[in-house]
Amino acid sequence: MPSPLGPPCLPVMDPETTLEEPETARLRFRGFCYQEVAGPREALARLRELCCQWLQPEAHSKEQMLEMLVLEQFLGTLPPEIQAWVRGQRPGSPEEAAALVEGLQHDPGQLLGWITAHVLKQEVLPAAQKTEEPLGSPHPSGTVESPGEGPQDTRIEGSVQLSCSVKEEPNVDGQEVAPSSPPLAAQSPEGNHGHQEPASTSFHPPRIQEEWGLLDRSQKELYWDAMLEKYGTVVSLGLPPHQPEAQAQSELGMLLTGTGVCRSLRSGNESEGPPGCPEAQPPQGPGPAAWEGLSGAATPAPTVRPGTPPVPTQPTPAETRLEPAATPRKPYTCEQCGRGFDWKSVFVIHHRTHTSGPGVQSPGLATGESTEKPPQGEVAFPHHPRRSLTGPRSYPCEECGCSFSWKSQLVIHRKSHTGQRRHFCSDCGRAFDWKSQLVIHRKGHRPEVP
């Protein structure tokens, strides 16, 4: 039965709801769905309740609530990556949010570093950090139960954890560490649990960090420009990045292939390196008997009577997870080493490792067109102009000769030569580079309205 018509009434708020964080209340208000309630009047009442939890009219004045609404609308007009970065800084007023955006115009590296660390899931020059475990303490996933101590599901869960922990990890010296077998040591009569090699807590392996340090400044800038252009293309099309996190990690390993790194950063899978690369060979892991020992539930071998046909055995869940998954075909393939790439920008950077001079290019790179068609399911935009990464940078400075990839960088750089600030304050005479800074500055001269 619909509720009777009448003036809207503000719902009574609980004290616990009033004390919750404003950001959580804002997300609940903005993320409200009509399907959560039974009808339109219930939806309207729920929206009023969520709005009161966010704005808190009993604690804020009308001007403060207006500023909160203006700040929310201002952040909603920003591009997605800039909006996420500004929200992370938690601005308290619209002027503070505008000042943060202006700071990005002077120092675009802040936004690029945030995109690299949070969106592309790559840390900027991570430090090699390791956590050491006590020698006598057992690993949490190394506990092995006997067949009669617990149910079968517990033993299977333990085997999955152990199968995930046995993986080759490069140490500080760059040598491969063979997978250890702590369950075998745990079953020793002395009762020693054994220990594993300390796992690295850094995002990239130490070897990748060393190779990154060997790159010169131009190679690092070229890599950042390629990653920024790739991310900007995805954002401009309004599509989420379709590559998984492990694939984004592998592209940095492909970039460093020319300096000696043949192993990809793809977690759990090995890169497809050239035939002559010894690191691209699959590791020699333990056999089926060793994996049966790791599962903690040793099944006795069935007795076969003479004259009876062998019974086919079903693969265990642990063996099924060990089978390598089929890798999809990549649209850009290097003709010299056979390596495949999902992004043309990374393919262009990799191709430069094979060329002996700047004039050697593979077919299709000079014109900006790929030699192969895009995979099925992707949309090609032939009418969109694309900047070629093989040629020189297209925005040079007439004063010092420095070249820049983006025109905005050249505009900011030119102001360092002129030394002139075009926007002056008529009250105090201060000069500013941007008009928006002058507008914010002028508000400080106005008398505050009581």
Swiss-Prot record:
GO terms for cellular component: chromatin; extracellular space; nucleus. A zinc finger (C2H2-type) spans 332-359, 395-422, 423-450. Residues 26-108 form the SCAN box domain. InterPro entries: KRAB, KRAB_dom_sf, SCAN-C2H2_zinc_finger, SCAN_dom, SCAN_sf, Znf_C2H2_sf, Znf_C2H2_type. The modification Phosphothreonine is found at residue 308. Residues 208-254 form the KRAB domain. It is found in: Nucleus. Residues 287-306 have a biased composition (Low complexity). The keyword Protein transport does not apply. This is Zinc finger protein 446. The gene is ZNF446.
